[in-house]
């Protein structure tokens, strides 16, 4: 079973519009073992309502160690369509604000689409849409 550890959000101000930008860091566990993390960011812009996200799947050479040895990063966008359906798209690495990750590689879309961790990444995004209240409240506002 997947569980997400929710850190407090950080906030900055958007240089182009002056609106608040939300930055999230989350840690993902499966059966009480750390397996991944994700970063997410979003702001209120008149022309877009999407969350940019980077999911990092961690690998360990030594399972007894607390420190991972490799990360594979999957850049993506999360959004809701006109029918209120949750959507996820894998992106190229230059389409998200994170340029690199410690001990890892951020994949471009084509490489991510064919990567063996792709299904695990989409499983994590299901949980993001179900559990991450910051993202849920942004994408599904209660007006």
Where in the sequence are the language-model features?
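Acidic, low-complexity, intrinsically disordered interaction modules
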Residues: 35-124
């Amino acid at each position: 079973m997947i569980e997400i550890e929710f850190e407090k959000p950080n906030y900055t101000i958007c240089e182009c519009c002056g609106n608040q930008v939300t930055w999230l860091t989350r840690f993902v566990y499966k059966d009480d073992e750390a397996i991944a993390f994700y970063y997410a960011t979003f702001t209120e812009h008149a022309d877009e309502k999407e969350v940019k996200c980077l999911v990092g799947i961690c690998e360990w050479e030594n399972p007894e160690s607390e420190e991972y040895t490799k990360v594979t990063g999957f850049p993506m966008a999360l959004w809701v369509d006109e029918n209120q359906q949750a959507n996820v798209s894998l992106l190229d690495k230059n389409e998200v604000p994170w340029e690199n990750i410690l001990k890892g590689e951020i994949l471009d879309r084509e490489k991510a689409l064919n990567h063996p961790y792709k299904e695990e990444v989409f499983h994590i995004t299901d949980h993001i849409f179900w559990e991450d209240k910051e993202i849920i409240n942004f994408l599904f506002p209660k007006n």
